[in-house]
Amino acid sequence: MRVLGIETSCDETGIAIYDDEKGLLANQLYSQVKLHADYGGVVPELASRDHVRKTVPLIQEALKESGLTAKDIDAVAYTAGPGLVGALLVGATVGRSLAFAWDVPAIPVHHMEGHLLAPMLEDNPPAFPFVALLVSGGHTQLISVTGIGQYELLGESIDDAAGEAFDKTAKLLGLDYPGGPLLSKMAAQGTAGRFVFPRPMTDRPGLDFSFSGLKTFAANTIRDNGTDDQTRADIARAFEDAVVDTLMIKCKRALDQTGFKRLVMAGGVSANRTLRAKLAEMMKKRRGEVFYARPEFCTDNGAMIAYAGMVRFKAGATADLGVSVRPRWPLAELPAA
């Protein structure tokens, strides 16, 4: 079975083809980073227009890469939410139209389920049950996962997501958009301990997160200490350490609460090397396992949508002729497969 996956939820156009026997046959990605850089963030209208320009050509490239034709595709999966409504509508419209033209099923996919299942694309996929840390620019959540669609929300950010906090703090440090990876690179040159940031909401019970205060703390630290290169690096180090420690503390609590031995980390921030190293060390001490996707599958991509679409199709999920998207879509609302 071969599934074409279409991802257009934000500022990446991702197209992939997944075969349930041979694995990933094609993976095409176009990033709009340069388009939005001058604005310091994603401009929804520009994102939508660029998806219109890039989606069909990338589908053609994916078919060429895989050596397949339209007749070889058994289903078309597309991101139906959450995300930017205009961007979602581009992928949904193209996906639904192709499915109709090719006379194959159309499968709406939840963007965050795609991220959650991305580690399944690796050679050593996690087995159920596990705790999932979904950490990206728009989401920071801890999920108890006992099967496909069997998701229980354990905790989430009550304000900024971790990735959003990274980008906003990077902007305060004078870094270009998207600033998160640049901040991490700067943090590697920083001195540990010169500045100490709080670990938000770790002094009380519960699994929720709050990262907006760290941005304010960073702004005040920059104001009081100047912006020479070493000071900026030290502030970046303190900020990253605070976010990573907070995520690690909450993961420990989630594992203790569920009794699970496996931790899955997914979403754009899961590519952060410091976070990966700290969680790997933590799970080794707990005699557990940590799983994550390769870096190119941590950020938005079509491969995770194609894979999630295949899983959902096998569970009987298809869409009608209408095109609908959900900019807001709680993961817990998905049916069990």
Curated annotation (Swiss-Prot):
InterPro entries according to UniProt: ATPase_NBD, Gcp-like_dom, KAE1/TsaD, Peptidase_M22_CS, TsaD
Family, as annotated: Belongs to the KAE1 / TsaD family.
Chain segments annotated as transmembrane: none
NCBIfam families hit by this protein: gcp_kae1, T6A_TsaD_YgjD
GO biological process: tRNA threonylcarbamoyladenosine modification
Disulfide bonds: none
Record text on cofactor binding: Binds 1 Fe(2+) ion per subunit.
Keywords assigned by UniProt, alphabetized: Acyltransferase, Cytoplasm, Iron, Metal-binding, Transferase, tRNA processing
Record's catalysed reaction(s): L-threonylcarbamoyladenylate + adenosine(37) in tRNA = N(6)-L-threonylcarbamoyladenosine(37) in tRNA + AMP + H(+)
Cofactor: Fe(2+)
Name of protein: tRNA N6-adenosine threonylcarbamoyltransferase
Residues noted as binding Fe cation in the record, renumbered to the chain: 111, 115, 300
Binding site for substrate: 134-138, 167, 180, 272
Localization in the cell: Cytoplasm
Organism: Escherichia coli (strain SMS-3-5 / SECEC)
EC number: 2.3.1.234
Any one GO cellular component localisation term in the record: cytoplasm
Molecular function in Gene Ontology: iron ion binding; N(6)-L-threonylcarbamoyladenine synthase activity
Primary location recorded for the protein, binned into one broad class: cytoplasm
Record gene name: tsaD
Function: Required for the formation of a threonylcarbamoyl group on adenosine at position 37 (t(6)A37) in tRNAs that read codons beginning with adenine. Is involved in the transfer of the threonylcarbamoyl moiety of threonylcarbamoyl-AMP (TC-AMP) to the N6 group of A37, together with TsaE and TsaB. TsaD likely plays a direct catalytic role in this reaction.
A Pfam family recorded for this sequence: TsaD
